[in-house]
Amino acid sequence: MNPYNSLKLLLPALFCFTACKNEEMKLADFTSDGCSLFIDGTFEDPDLWKECCLKHDIAYWQGGTEEEREAADIAFRECVKKKTGNSELAEVMYQAVRQGGEPYYPTWYRWGYGWPIGRGYRALTVAEKDLVKIKLAEYRKSTSINQ
């Protein structure tokens, strides 16, 4: 048996491990467009529920598990309901994000949109959570938003 055969198998595995390890750190800077594909408020108050959308965007940007997405969507619905007093509007917006926010869609508003596409539903590692905190602090500092 040729001793180099084992090395031929080990090197590709090592490169794959290194590439997979680095992927967890590729988090884009946080961005928000308010209520993606929807208005941010009423004619009288154009930013009425925009704060709800910003909080929801923070959750969607960082991504995580399927349970975390569901919790973010429920919190979004409750925020809109509290801001507007309109349960029907809150439910329509909730259903829209439930249907359109899957992590597998190649959109700018998908679950986990801060990470490269294909991440799916995966819990954030400690290092990824730390990176999220850093990126959010940078965003807040640059926009003077204290969410």
State the predicted function of each range.
Residues C20-Q147:
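Extended terminal accessory/targeting regions
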